[in-house]
Amino acid sequence: MPVETISIPVTSRFGVTVYNVLLAHVPPTGRLLVQLPGKGYTCQHPLLYYLRQAALALGCDVLSVEYGFQAANAELDVQNAAYLMDDVWGAVRPVLERGYRRVCIAGKSLGTPLAGELARALETPEVSLILLTPIGGALQGLDDIPTLAIIGTDDALYSPEVVAAFDQHPRITWKVYEGLNHSLESGGWRASLAALPEIIGVCEAFLESERA
């Protein structure tokens, strides 16, 4: 199935125009994956790059979002952090006009609370979440939204208590990887590469489970 590349420009309050990328199948499939990156972990880093490839192979269109502070090489602080959701909505709104019936939002670190906020606000019939190294209150208030949460035990933000607190949630599935850090990598490149297909495979299975 052919895939076209569509640029989604967003005039950001960080003072730049960001050109987000939508990879869309022809003809449309009705399924969308939105990628919300981390602060320093963009959509071109391994986890999000290969998740994009897996999602495309499953027939999802993929919107890869870039934040204005990243394009502007600006510092993110308490005052301008509120602009992030403006960047996200600026990219997502015109894409949703294509009429998707199923949307999965994949957030990495900084992108995880933004993903949760977006998921709660969408009026799309079916919405799900992939939270890669969730931070803050990203898992709060998700209610009946199907969610896959992934973290490593060497992540400074890993908390067995937090995992346990959501262990009985009927719609949240945790995958905890021994020895992986906040980038879901290990100390050596071989171990990091070995972990990558397993993580992407879990995400792929989750997307398949949400497949029409």
PLM regions and their residue ranges:
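Primarily recognizes the serine-hydrolase "nucleophile elbow" in alpha/beta-hydrolase
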Residues: 88-146
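Short beta-strand/loop motif that positions the catalytic acidic residue
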Residues: 143-144, 149-151, 155, 163
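Acidic catalytic loop of the alpha/beta-hydrolase fold
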Residues: 152-158, 181-183
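Conserved loop-alpha-helix segment in the C-terminal half of the alpha/beta-hydrolase fold
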Residues: 159-172
